[in-house]
């Protein structure tokens, strides 16, 4: 098994470079896992701060559009109420005329 997969050197000694590389890789993975857990815990505690960073403040155009649509709804509601009162007024006039006759 001379020189097979870098485990044994030609002189019969064990090559530890694979083990060292494995140890370094696992250390890196452990650090990444610990940092990600820490970031996850921080994110859970400070969710609102983080979301405030990513939310876009409303522009002036959207505010005016919303006001425009609110105004249109109010105008339409006012028109409907006026039509309702006019209809009720005519119904009352008809009922009064019937009772008088």
UniProtKB/Swiss-Prot annotation:
Entry annotated with the keyword Transmembrane helix: yes
Membrane topology: Single-pass membrane protein
Localisation per UniProt entry: Membrane
Keywords from the UniProt entry: Membrane, Transmembrane, Transmembrane helix
Keyword Magnesium: no
Record InterPro entries: SMIM19
GO CC terms in record: membrane
TM region(s), chain numbering: 25-43
PANTHER family: SMALL INTEGRAL MEMBRANE PROTEIN 19
Family the entry assigns: Belongs to the SMIM19 family.
Protein name stated in the entry: Small integral membrane protein 19
Source organism per UniProt: Xenopus tropicalis
């Amino acid at each position: 098994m001379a020189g097979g997969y870098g485990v044994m050197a030609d002189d019969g000694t064990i090559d530890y470079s694979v083990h060292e590389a494995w140890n370094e890789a696992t250390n890196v993975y452990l650090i990444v896992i610990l940092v990600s857990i820490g970031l996850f815990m921080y994110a859970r505690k400070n969710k609102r701060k983080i979301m405030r960073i990513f939310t876009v403040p409303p522009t002036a155009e959207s505010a005016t559009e919303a006001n425009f649509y609110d105004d249109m709804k109010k105008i339409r509601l006012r028109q409907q109420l006026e039509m309702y009162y006019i209809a009720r007024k005519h119904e009352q006039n008809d009922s009064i005329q019937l009772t008088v006759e």
